[in-house]
């Protein structure tokens, strides 16, 4: 009986010594160690940084100053995809202001006429380059961001979109679709509550949502509800970024019409 007690006692002492030695030689989980682990773990379940990308198509317009005022007041950034023939002499200062206040700008189209720009590769790049050059004339910058009117999966561009994307990449131009839409251009002045609801229903499905909104005279309610949308995004824990900070995103090929 005594031998058995000593045996059990000895096993306990040995276990304590082994644990102490293991603990002594194991690096502490400092904040630095944790950060390195998170960066290099490669775990696909790991959350990406929550950054939202507000984007506005079809400007500049008469509501662009209101959009910029709201973004400035809310300390949010955005990306504007511009229409070349909307950059009138009177609106040149608006485009300059977009850049001055830390936003990004990209090419949308010059004409926004599908029957002209999507006829073939030649007509597409004529339209693209005309818009790009107009932006350069005003800002001195040749934009590197681009968005296809109606998205990269629309039926007009589908037959040639892969070739267009390849040629754009050779020009160091990056194209972006979206994964959240306010659906603010489906009709004339869509109600504010509808735009807000459309953004809210899909926002949290993504760690890096690209949010499609419009900057045009027929989407005036977008500028009126923008402050509430920005508040919602911030409340959900997102910061705001511009698309020049994000990798390319285009719709999957399976979505093409």
Locate the predicted segments by residue.
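Terminal accessory/targeting
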Residues: 1-53, 69-78, 206-257
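Weak global preference for isoleucine
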Residues: 8, 13, 18, 63, ...
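Active-site beta->alpha N-cap acidic-glycine motif
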Residues: 29-123, 127-142, 248
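Catalytic domains of cell-wall/extracellular-matrix polysaccharide-remodeling enzymes
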Residues: 112-212, 216-234, 245-246, 252-256
